[in-house]
């Protein structure tokens, strides 16, 4: 829960180790205090350490959504899987902090629908900073099944119990790097509005040509 002094020294030491390891990497833009650990004095101490040692970077922590008394922990409003209308409500309240989805669009199975509702928020609100898809790649291991086929195996495929079965299969690419159908949607909505418009026009022209070809065939 991040409360009390029992683990404060340990969590600040973890923050220090991460900062010293990664501080010279140009790709590091934001320090994170952790994931799904509520909020309290211990986590606040991590933020204070980051701000003191590296004021050039922001600090992120989602857990304050469960304990607003420690809102100072994070430099941005962060949520997991917030609904588009919830985000809009926040952004329309003239907030002091930008909004970011630290997890969204959980891509398990044939999913990832509705991305449009999130991406279009960026066209309206400068404070909407987008989100991080959960996640990029399935966690799976290639093995030979009972029929002798080489397949990607998940929980339960290795005589392991208990298991979450295919819950680890939530990426936009398979474990071997092959793209899932959802990648088409990601590629489209992550393009610029101008590129999306050009793609729509090209698709409309192709559909019209197909209709003419079909009519001529009849």
Language model segments and positions:
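Extended substrate-binding grooves/exosites of carbohydrate-active enzymes
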Residues: 1-218
